[in-house]
Amino acid sequence: RVRSSAASDVYKRQDLGTSGNKATLFDESGLLIASRTAAYPTDYASGNRAEQNPHDWWKAIVDTTQALLELVSPADIAGVALSGQMMGCLCVDKNGRPLRPHMLYCDQRSQKEETILSEKIDPLHFYEITGHRISASYSIEKLMWVKKHEPEIFAQTAKMLNAKDYI
């Protein structure tokens, strides 16, 4: 073990990125103690799609956490921070279970929904409300795509989450 309970506090960080999860340990001064990474696949199917399996994220979190806990005692960890990829679309049911693969920010199949949204609301007004432009990269357009193309999934959707929110 690299730390003991007599050592200064240790902080654990998980970054659920596009290509993998990076878990790190820092001391209270910000010095990096250790880092572990676990990759997961992205399915780049035809039609501008980019999807991931949320179960792969969870496995990566578990694997990297277990690897770091071989180096420090859980009692030494004073705090945990989680960051992750954004602008995706993960539809979950009322029990929090994924209903379909997660659509990543780079999934562009909702370009028609982007156009529809632009016709229904002034893009400047949309920006004033949300702080974002209308784009197939964002979550709302992806959810609109699910509603149109996978109505049975949309009907079961209790929440739409981003990757880190699911974890």
Map each language-model feature to its residues.
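Single conserved hydrophobic/aromatic residue that forms the stacking wall/gate
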Residues: 1-7, 11
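Ser/Thr-centric signal marking residues that sit
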Residues: 4, 18-19, 130
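Hydrophobic packing within well-folded, soluble alpha/beta domains
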Residues: 10, 23-25, 61
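A short acidic Gly-Thr/Ser loop motif
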Residues: 15-19, 82-85
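Short glycine-rich, Thr/Ser-proximal phosphate-binding strand/loop in the N-terminal lobe
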Residues: 16-54, 97-105
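N-terminal phosphate-binding loop and adjacent alpha-helix
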Residues: 36-74, 118
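Glycine-rich phosphate-binding/catalytic subdomain of phosphoryl-transfer
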Residues: 62-167
